[in-house]
Amino acid sequence: MNTNNIKKYAPQARNDFRDAVIQKLTTLGIAADKKGNLQIAEAETIGETVRYGQFDYPLSTLPRRERLVKRAREQGFEVLVEHCAYTWFNRLCAIRYMELHGYLDHGFRMLSHPETPTAFEVLDHVPEVAEALLPESKAQLVEMKLSGNQDEALYRELLLGQCHALHHAMPFLFEAVDDEAELLLPDNLTRTDSILRGLVDDIPEEDWEQVEVIGWLYQFYISEKKDAVIGKVVKSEDIPAATQLFTPNWIVQYLVQNSVGRQWLQTYPDSPLKDKMEYYIEPAEQTPEVQAQLAAITPASIEPESIKVLDPACGSGHILTEAYNVLKAIYEERGYRTRDIPQLILENNIFGLDIDDRAAQLSGFAMLMLARQDDRRILGRGVRLNIVSLQESKLDIAEVWTKLNFHQHMQRGSMGDMFTQGTALANTDSAEYKLLMRTLALFTSAKTLGSLIQVPQEDEAALKAFLERLYRLAVEGDIQQKEAAAELIPYIQQAWILAQRYDAVVANPPYMGGKGMNGDLKEFAKKQFPDSKSDLFAMFMQHAFSLLKENGFNAQVNMQSWMFLSSYEALRGWLLDNKTFITMAHLGARAFGQISGEVVQTTAWVIKNNHSGFYKPVFFRLVDDNEEHKKNNLLNRMNCFKNTLQNDFKKIPGSPIAYWATLAFINSFLKLPALGTRAVKGLDTNGSIDVFLRRWPEVSINSFDALGKGNSKWFPIAKGGELRKWFGNHEYIINYENDGIELRKNKANLRNKDMYFQEGGTWTVVSTTGFSMRYMPKGFLFDQGGSAVFCENNDELSIYNILACMNSKYINYSASLICPTLNFTTGDVRKFPVIKNNHLEDLAKKAIEISKADWNQFETSWEFSKNKLIEHKGNVAYSYASYCNFQDKLYEQLVNIEKNINNIIEEILGFKIETTENSELITLNSNKIYRYGQSETNDTFLNRHRSDTISELISYSVGCQMGRYSLDREGLVYAHEGNKGFAELAAEGAYKTFPADNDGILPLMDDEWFEDDVTSRVKEFVRTVWGEEHLQENLEFIAESLCLYAIKPKKGESALETIRRYLSTQFWKDHMKMYKKRPIYWLFSSGKEKAFECLVYLHRYNDATLSRMRTEYVVPLLARYQANIDRLNDQLDEASGGEATRLKRERDSLIKKFSELRSYDDRLRHYADMRISIDLDDGVKVNYGKFGDLLADVKAITGNAPEAI
C-alpha cells in the first residue's frame, strides 16, 4: 500500500472536517470566542421552526441541539468539535471502504460512482436504495428525485439512512436515529467542492484493498494533533494523539505468529499452521532439562474457542486483524465451517481495549470487515464484539440502580414510584450492587490510566454473569431498565475484559516518558509500577503479565531503552528472575517507515509468563538499515543469535539484554574489577547554562583562570562534546567566582565539589558516536554532560591507566553492551571493567601528549601558540607539505599506541575483541576521516584539508591584523577588554614585525575601496612571513587552495581577487563555524548590497568604536560612491551600445549601494551617539544584540531578530 496519498489527505481532512463542524455549530448558535469561552445563542421558537441566533431550523432539531449544547458545556467547545469531526470522518471512511468492497446491502456506491467522476451511484438508483434503507419514505424520496432540483436534500436523506441502517451491525460507529451528530453532517455534499471529494478523489481505489487502510487514515488524521502535544505535559484527552503509532504489518505478524500461533504449535508441533506463518521463529535447541520442563507445562490438547487474545492498546485494530487470521487458520485446521468461524472468533477469542473512542470504533469496524470477507451475512447476525473504548465512570449510581430495578422490587407505574429512591438504597447489600460500586470506582480515571487499571480476577465470573443479565435487560426490560442497562454495559464489559486472563497479550503500547505524564498518571505510575514508571510502554509491558494465564505469551513492540538503561535495571531483573524470553527482533531505529531518525529505537519480543533461566531465546539483530532491509533480514533469519542462556544476562553489570555478546566476553565481567565510585556526576546550573557558561574566547583573558588558582571569575569546565579520546574539547568556562557564590544563589547543584580542580578524566554523557574518555588537567570543573573520573586515595590505578582502559576496544565494546543507547550515565560507566597494567599507563601518557599537540594546533584552543604554516620559510606550498607531514606523524604514532593498548588488553583477557563502529577511530583532527567523516573520496579529503588549512591561515592572519596574535610573540597577545592596554603592548614592540591595526576595525569589501582593507593586509602578511621573492607564487597557492573547497573557482580572476572574494563572501561563515556562533570578529554590514562591511575585534571594541567606524570609513566611502556615480554619469553621456549598457549597470549598482550606505549611516550615527559599552562577561549572545541591525546574522547568534529603529 502506498501511504503517501493518505499521508497527504488525512491531516488536511481533519482540518476540513473541523471547519465544517464549526460552521454547522455556528448555524446552531454554538460557538466559542478566541479565548475558548462558550457562546450559546438562545433558542427562539417561531411556529414550526426554531431560531438559533440568525439561523432557522425545524423545531424537531431542538432536543438534539440541546444535547450538543450540554456536551459543549461539559466537554468544552474544542473537544466537541474534535469528537464530531472524527465521528463523521470515521463514518464516511467506513462507508467508502464498504462500497468499494460491495458490502452495502443495496449494492450501490454511496459516496461515488463507478463510471462518472463527481457523481453518486445511489442517485441513479433511488427506488432500489430507498427500498433498502428507508422503505417508509420511498415514495417521497422518489418524488424528490423526479423533481430534478432536490438532489442535495435527497442525497443527505439517503446518506443518513445508510448510517441508520449500519447502526444495527455497528452501533459503536453508527448511532441510531436522532443522533445529535447528524445535525453536524456538513452541507453541500453533492457539489464538486464537497468535503467528500478528497476522500474519493485523493486516495486511489487500490489503496482501499486492505482493511489496514483504516489504521493509516487514523494515524495520519491525528498526526498534526500528535505533533502539537508531543514534548508537553499531556492532558488526558490528548493522550491518544500523543501515544498512538500504527504498527507495520510485518512486525504485527511476527508478534502474533510467535504468541498466538506458538500457543497452538506447542501442543500440535506438526500443525500445517507453521507453514502459513512466515515470521514464526523455531525455538533454539534446548538442553534435556529445559525440554522436560517445557513438556510438563504444555497442554495435551487445545480447543480453538478457548484461546483468548487481548490487545490492551488496540488502536485501529491492526494487531487484532492479524490475530483473526491466525485463529481462522486454527479453526479451519480443526474442520469448522468457514461461515461459522468469524462469529466464533469475534465473540470468543478476540478482545481489545483503548482509551480512544475513535480508535476503538475503527478497530471494531476492521474486525467486522475481516469477518465479512468470510461470512457475507455477518453484519446481520448481531455479533457482540469484545472491543471497547474505556469509559470513565461519571454516572449517578443511585439513579441508574433505581432505573435498573435489578431485583424487580419495584412496580413501574404504581405507588411504588413514590418510594423509588428509598427502595433502591434499601437493596445496596446485594452482591450485584457491591460489584457495581467497586467496579465503577476503578474507572474514575479510565481515560488517563486505560488498560493499566487492575480489575481483580476473582470478579471475572460475577462480572460475566452481571453482564449477561444486563444484555437481557437491554432487550427485554422496561423503558427505564433498557436505558439503565445500556448505560452500565460499557463499564461492566470493560471490567470483565480486564478481569479475564489471556493466552496471549499482544500490543504496541503507548510511549510516554515521565515528562509528558500529567499529575494523576505520574502518581499512579509511582505507586503501581515502581520498576517501570519511567515510561508508559514499560508499565504496559509489566502489566501485561498480570493479564496472562500462567504460561501465556506477552508479545509487544516497544522502545529498546528497557533493555539497557539503568532506570529499567529493576524491571530487567524482575523479568530475568520470573519470566522466560522466547524470541526478540531487535529493530533499532527506522523500523517504522513513517518515523525517521535515531530517536525512536524499538524492539519486538515475545516473553512467556513462566520462568526458565536456562532457556535459550532466539534473537535477531536488525538495528541497521531501513524498514525494508529489517523485514527481509527477519524473513531470511539473518543476524540470528541463539546460544545465550537467559541467566547469562545477569552476569553483565546492570543485566542489559546484550544478546550479541560472546560468552567469553560476558564472563570477563565476572573476573575484572569495575571502575566503581571513581566515576562521579558533575554539577548542574539549575537550568541557567546561558547565565553561567561561556565559550572561553568570549571573555577577557584577564578574568579567565585556566589553572584553577581560584582568584578569577571564569574557570574551565568539562562539558562533554564530540567524540574525542585522550585530550581536548576544552571549549567552555564557568562563572565560579568566589567559590561559586552566584551558582549557589541560583540553587545550582554543585555535586562532588571536593573533586573540582583535580586531575582526572572526563567523558561525554550523551553521544551518538560512542564512548571515549579524555584527560582532564588540574584546574577544571565538570558538569553533568561531561562527568568525570578521579583516582581515589592510595588507588592502585592511575588516571592514565584508567584512560588507557576507557579508550580501548574492550571498553568500547563493553559500552555497546551496557549502554547501547545515546547515554553513558555515571551509573553505567561505573560498571565498566578496568585492568591494571604499567605498560598501559605509559602508553596513555604518550597518547595524551599527541592528542594535546593535535588540539593545540587550532586557534580555538587557549594553548594555541601560532599557526603551524608560519613555522616554515620559503613558500606556502612547502609549509603546507611540512604541516601535512607533521600531522601524518601524529596520526601514525597514535595508531601504534592504540594498537599496543588493545593488544595488551586482549592478551590479558585471552580472547580477541570485536571491533565496533568508531572503536578504532583515531580521534585527531590530523585524521581526515575523523575530521570530515567517511563519506568522501580521498581526493575530496585532500582538497578539503588543504582548503581548510589555508582558511585557518587567513583566520590567523586576521588575528594578527587585529592584535589578537603577533608574529613576535606566541599565544594570545591581546584578548583583554575595551582596547585597554593595547597601546602599551604596541609600544613594547609586541607587533613590531607585522603591525596590528590601530583601532581593531578592518574593512571587508568586495572591491578595493580602502588601501588598508583585510585583503591588502592579508597580502602584506604573506609578504612579511614568506618574503617578497615568492609573494605572487604564494598568493596563487592560497587562491588555488581556497577554490578547492571553500569557494568555487572563477575564470579570469587574479589570485588577489580570489582571496578578496573569499574574504567578502565566505570568511564570515567560516568564522561563525569555527567559533560555534560566538564570533570574536564581528561583522558590521550595511545590508544585502554589501555597500559597507567591516570586522571589529570584540576584545578591542569600546564606546568610541562606532564613531570611529563612521568618521574613518563610512562617511569617506559615501563621498567615494557619489564621486564614482558622478564620473559614470559623465561617461554615460558620451557612451553608446554595449559600453553604455555596461556603464549603466555599474552606475545602478553603485546607486543601490549609495542608498543602502546612506541609510546605514543614519542608523550608525544613532548608535554611535549612544556610546554603547559592552561587558564581555555577558557573552557574545547578549552583547551582539545591542546594536540593532548594524550587524550581520543577529538572529543566528542571539536567537532574536534585531530591533529596528
Swiss-Prot record:
Its EC number is 2.1.1.72. Induction: Transcribed at slowly increasing levels as cells progress from lag to exponential to stationary phase. (Microbial infection) Methyltransferase activity is inhibited by phage T7 protein OCR (AC P03775, gene 0.3). Viability of cells overexpressing OCR is unaffected. PROSITE patterns: N6_MTASE, PTS_HPR_SER. It catalyses: a 2'-deoxyadenosine in DNA + S-adenosyl-L-methionine = an N(6)-methyl-2'-deoxyadenosine in DNA + S-adenosyl-L-homocysteine + H(+). Pfam families: Eco57I (PF07669). One of its GO terms (biological process) is defense response to virus. Disulfide bonds: none annotated. GO terms for molecular function: nucleic acid binding; site-specific DNA-methyltransferase (adenine-specific) activity. Belongs to the methyltransferase superfamily. PglX adenine methyltransferase family. (Microbial infection) Interacts with phage T7 protein Ocr (AC P03775, gene 0.3) during an infection and when the protein is expressed from a plasmid; this interaction inhibits the enzymatic activity of PglX/BrxX through high-affinity binding. Forms a 2:2 tetrameric complex with phage T7 OCR. BREX systems (bacteriophage exclusion) provide immunity against bacteriophage. Part of a type 1 BREX system which protects against dsDNA phage. This system allows phage adsorption but prevents phage DNA replication, without degradation of the phage DNA. Methylation of bacterial DNA by this protein guides self/non-self discrimination. Methylates the adenine in the fifth position of the hexamer 5'-GGTAAG-3' in genomic DNA; methylates the same sequence in the few phage that escape the BREX system. Methylated phage are now resistant to BREX, showing immunity is provided by an epigenetic modification. Expression of this protein alone has no effect on phage infection, does not lead to methylated DNA and mildly inhibits growth. NCBIfam families: BREX_1_MTaseX. This is Adenine-specific methyltransferase BrxX. It comes from Escherichia coli O9:H4 (strain HS).
